[in-house]
Amino acid sequence: MSNGAADRARLRHLDHCRQPHCFARDICVFTYFELPEEHPQGPAHGVRITVEKGIDTHLIKFFTKRPLLVEKDQGNTILTLYCICPVPGLHEDFCCHLCAEFNHL
């Protein structure tokens, strides 16, 4: 499976996604993988996104005597979906399930 196929799947997902936060819109690395039978988690195939390190900043101005700035510094987050069906491939529903999990981050 080429990176081109993964990119096309990401674009197809982006076309119909209605999630508030979508991995296809965000800056992250999206890859498809296949694990051989001898791999500890194999045989399996699936998709993975790596969300780069980021800083989230917001202001607390209610229920406080003075405004407070909150800063959350997060490292890289890796989200992986494994499929153990007997037919390896980039299944159409991978992106939708991955996006739903991405919204739980």
Swiss-Prot record:
InterPro entries assigned: Adeno_E3A
Source organism (scientific name): Human adenovirus A serotype 12
Function recorded in the entry: Not yet known.
Domain of life: Viruses
Pfam families: Adeno_E3A
Family the entry assigns: Belongs to the adenoviridae E3A-2 family.
Name of the molecule in the record: Early E3A 12.1 kDa protein
